[in-house]
Amino acid sequence: MPSYGNLGRLGGRHEYGVLVAMTSSAELDRVRWAHQLRSYRIASVLRIGVVGLMVAAMVVGTSRSEWPQQIVLIGVYAVAALWALLLAYSASRRFFALRRFRSMGRLEPFAFTAVDVLILTGFQLLSTDGIYPLLIMILLPVLVGLDVSTRRAAVVLACTLVGFAVAVLGDPVMLRAIGWPETIFRFALYAFLCATALMVVRIEERHTRSVAGLSALRAELLAQTMTASEVLQRRIAEAIHDGPLQDVLAARQELIELDAVTPGDERVGRALAGLQSASERLRQATFELHPAVLEQVGLGPAVKQLAASTAQRSGIKISTDIDYPIRSGIDPIVFGVVRELLSNVVRHSGATTASVRLGITDEKCVLDVADDGVGVTGDTMARRLGEGHIGLASHRARVDAAGGVLVFLATPRGTHVCVELPLKR
């Protein structure tokens, strides 16, 4: 049996042959929301197809005398389907779509699923001896099967089954034509389809929990890696400050004293300039490894100093817009993200200008870092993570663990990264 480290010690369960950690509710909700948004979008597209099938069923399978009320019903459903489609894709960027989806909760998808049940059941009731409208109702379990909540799916499927029974029993022409044995068989077949859809939802729910568990484990491992890296950086910074930097400062002081005794020696002047440059570089290195200013005066000045030193070193024009007058427990996380993003701008973007904005909105720390370089997307970062580059991915994991979000936003040129974190005072 392989060892899973903290996962095994903290407790977990096997799902699909994988040991999954007992996932936090926040991580589970995050993954469930993402899956629910995906399912909601798929269902909104399928609804358009259902509208087309309803029109076809009306034309080939119902009497012309029933068309007026059916057209009205199909028209209402078409409007609802288009509305659902617009809501599902109203935000072109996944971040804002997901945030809107979180704010609306579970009511919107449930409401449209209820509309599906009512409209398709009504369509069958308006169709005398219509086998095709009855076949359209088979699509209901398919739409419900895209859900990720077993309880909600069970309620909807039960209502769907009742609607199917009402539609069949409410058509006396069909009852006389097929008789009770075939009616019972059709009901049993539909019940089987509903049960199958419920099992699919259950499997999807378990899959969601598995993904959430693995995501939480990955975040934990990345956070541990970052913590170890920060400890190492602090030790290196202290070693540089207490060792080489002090030696350089001492040597520079001796040269200053020598220059006072024997002024005018150009070699001494060049040595002093070199030692001055070396001491500044060492101070900058210790600042980036362990920013004392972050502990002394706060995140805002630390970010401003980091941007200024990065601009001076790289030649990139970096503007700052900082309105962050408080201190918070998330400050080290935010500073680490800024440091990593500016490092990526210098190393990979080829940008000539960049901007850093830091502020507070709705009790959240909001960070925006943008540049005019070659551009980086979330897919690019995922590929780099697969290649072993965990820098930004580890910071994203820490942001997620703190209840925040780090996303790449669409921009005509360059890269735009937005970070939101709830404040911890």
UniProtKB/Swiss-Prot annotation:
It is an enzyme of class 2 (transferase). The chain crosses the membrane at residues 42-62, 71-91, 107-127, 130-150, 155-175, 181-201. Residues 224-425 form the Histidine kinase domain. InterPro entries: HATPase_C_sf, His_kinase_dom, Sensor_HK_TwoCompSys. Its EC number is 2.7.13.3. CDD domains: HATPase_UhpB-NarQ-NarX-like. It is a multi-pass membrane protein. GO terms for biological process: phosphorelay signal transduction system. This is Sensor histidine kinase NarS. It comes from Mycobacterium tuberculosis (strain ATCC 25618 / H37Rv).
